[in-house]
Amino acid sequence: MTDRQTDRQTDRQTDRQTDRQTDRQTDRQTDGRTVSQTMNIIFSSDHYYAPYLAVSIFSIIKNTPKKINFYILDMKINQENKTIINNLASAYSCKVFFLPVCESDFQNFPKTIDYISLATYARLNLTKYIKNIEKAIYIDVDTLTNSSLQELWNIDITNYYLAACRDTFIDVKNEAYKKTIGLEGYSYFNAGILLINLNKWKEENIFQKSINWMNKYNNVMKYQDQDILNGICKGKVKFINNRFNFTPTDRDLIKKKNLLCVKMPIVISHYCGPNKFWHKKCSHLNCHIGNLLLKEMDKIIDIPSSWYDHFEKIPFLIKIKRLRKRIKDN
């Protein structure tokens, strides 16, 4: 038996490659449409959010056994963290492309929410950074994927700008706000998870439309790029079940009022709002999984002890391991 055969990462890669070969053989929809063999997923992140980005990526890789290209709209992520994320993706035969974004490009856009970075505005200009792909899934960093993204990826958006889930916090509780930003009579979507038709975005010059909309509603908009996307995409959105973007508000509506029909299983848990999956106060669906994923990642790639400091909900045994890593690092 060779050293290579006993190598943990090689074994995992081999298993993953086998899964993807099987997946490619069945990678067609029942209605006959061919689905792209490579899934394109976009994140936007700065240096501080890199550990959470890695965990979110890992949750996708574990649940979606196929070749994935990850495109990171990169706001000054340092090289060490880039290397860690690249190593994680490579262990599962996936690729990561870091696309430098200059935050000054969006300095005139309003920052109305303290816990949302200006990095989110970068996606308004996606076609500048990402070339030669027709479709992509955009996912916020504050998410954990619970099952395969294949069903989401398969959705036909040929005649739409994007597919998205209703934002029940706005749609159910803030109808008056929609009127304020010109969306009376339209459903309002949460922009944390989007299936994007990049061909349409290029044809319609979405970035210029974003600037025009922002200039008109700058004094009244509250939810940054999410408001902008709702404003410029109204009438061109394919609304999908909230199982693809399950928020704390969705959970509350189901528990208290049963006003929302969500099919099972929940594909993506979205920790929008101030309490994220790495916070002690977070109680949203599967928030504890973030810590477990961090621990599992550490068995696959060597992550720095400082990453554990980013997670408040750390089990006792992981705290011990963190202490040992600090001693070793020093």
Swiss-Prot record:
Residues 1-32 are annotated as: Disordered. One of its GO terms (molecular function) is metal ion binding. It comes from the Bacteria. The keyword Transferase applies. InterPro entries: Glyco_trans_8, Glycosyltrans_8_dom-fam, Nucleotide-diphossugar_trans. Keywords: Glycosyltransferase, Manganese, Metal-binding, Transferase. Residues 1-31 have a biased composition (Basic and acidic residues). Pfam families: Glyco_transf_8. It is an enzyme of class 2 (transferase). Mn(2+) binds at residues 140, 142, 270. Its EC number is 2.-.-.-. SUPFAM superfamilies: Nucleotide-diphospho-sugar transferases. Belongs to the glycosyltransferase 8 family. PANTHER family: GLYCOSYLTRANSFERASE 8 DOMAIN-CONTAINING PROTEIN (PTHR13778), LIPOPOLYSACCHARIDE 1,3-GALACTOSYLTRANSFERASE (PTHR13778:SF47). This is Putative glycosyltransferase HI_0258. It comes from Haemophilus influenzae (strain ATCC 51907 / DSM 11121 / KW20 / Rd).
